[in-house]
Amino acid sequence: MSQNNNDIYILGIESSCDDTSCSIIKNGILLSNVTANQSIHEQYGGVIPELASRDHQKNIVPVVDAALKKAHVTLSQINAIAVTRGPGLSGSLLVGLSFAKSLALALNIPLMEVNHMQGHILAHFIDEEGFDKPTFPFLALKIGRA
């Protein structure tokens, strides 16, 4: 994968509920998206917050590593880290935020905290060929399950 000095690589981390996800974006193009699902909750009929945060702790390093490998990108190429800051399960968010903040500090790169709901809405403007930037302001309706 060729790189020039103007390339911008962003590592994104999502851990607001029971999925641990990491994506790598280069200049607005999605290079990789890796998710670890937590099947442990199926037996309870819903997400158990404490179990979710424990699984995030177990999954976050392998998920980030897999996303970097799939994108053929090294940590030294990453220019910034984006991470979900909420809303979500507090323990799950804490795992993602702590990991992202520690990594950003270690790499001496910016950390961008992302609102989970805004992320759902704006994710529709990302595709594998780049961004179609929305014209702001705009109105959106987000319907979720409880």
Enumerate the language-model features and the residues they cover.
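N-terminal beta-alpha supersecondary unit
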Residues: 6-87, 120
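Short glycine- and acidic-rich boundary segments immediately preceding or forming the N-terminal edge
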Residues: 1-3, 105-106
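Conserved phosphate-binding catalytic cores of ATP/NTP-utilizing and phosphoryl-transfer enzymes
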Residues: 2-6, 114-138
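Structural motif
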Residues: 8-11, 79-80, 110-112, 137-141
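Nucleotide and nucleotide-moiety/phosphate-recognizing core
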Residues: 71-77, 99-116, 123-125
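Catalytic cores of large soluble enzymes that bind and process phosphate-bearing ligands
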Residues: 52-59, 91, 95, 110-113
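Conserved small/polar residues in nucleotide/adenosyl-binding loops
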Residues: 146
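Short Gly/Thr/Asp-enriched flexible loops that form oxyanion-binding sites at enzyme active sites
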Residues: 83-107, 126-127
